[in-house]
């Protein structure tokens, strides 16, 4: 079993974008920004424990930080990790919290 304190540090934020919204509607998939050292097993355990849903699969990718300019200097944004979490049929995570 994975430490509960570690599970709380794995998921950083939901990643809301046009692509994430399309994936959510078409494939019952939710996109999260996760810790860069998180494994697929940790991500699956964290989502199942925190949101009380059943996870079918997890796909991850590392997003490279963009180079940005501030005046004459160049800087670089941090690299981060993205996780596409596919939920089982009938499972749903509502980030907005609107009751209908």
UniProtKB/Swiss-Prot annotation:
Keyword field: Ribonucleoprotein, Ribosomal protein, RNA-binding, rRNA-binding
> Per its record, what are the GO molecular function terms?
rRNA binding; structural constituent of ribosome
Q: Disulphide bridges in this chain?
A: none
According to its record, what are the GO cellular component terms?
ribonucleoprotein complex; ribosome
Q: Which domain of life is it from?
A: Bacteria
The record's Gene Ontology biological-process terms are: translation
Supply the PANTHER family for this chain.
60S RIBOSOMAL PROTEIN L23A (PTHR11620)
Q: How does it assemble?
A: Part of the 50S ribosomal subunit. Contacts protein L29, and trigger factor when it is bound to the ribosome.
According to its UniProt entry, what is the function of this protein? Answer: One of the early assembly proteins it binds 23S rRNA. One of the proteins that surrounds the polypeptide exit tunnel on the outside of the ribosome. Forms the main docking site for trigger factor binding to the ribosome.
Q: What family is this?
A: Belongs to the universal ribosomal protein uL23 family.
Q: What is the name listed in the Swiss-Prot or TrEMBL entry for this protein?
A: Large ribosomal subunit protein uL23
> Source species, please?
Colwellia psychrerythraea (strain 34H / ATCC BAA-681) (Vibrio psychroerythus)
Gene name on record?
A: rplW
């Amino acid at each position: 079993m994975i430490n509960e304190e570690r599970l709380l540090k794995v998921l950083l934020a939901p990643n809301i974008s046009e692509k994430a919204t399309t994936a959510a509607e078409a494939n019952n998939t939710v996109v999260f920004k996760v810790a860069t050292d998180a494994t697929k097993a940790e991500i699956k355990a964290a989502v199942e424990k925190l949101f009380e849903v059943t996870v079918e699969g997890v796909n991850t990718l590392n997003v490279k930080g963009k180079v940005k300019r501030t005046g004459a200097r160049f800087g670089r944004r941090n690299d981060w990790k993205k996780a596409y979490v596919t939920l089982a049929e009938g499972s749903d995570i509502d980030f907005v919290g609107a009751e209908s």
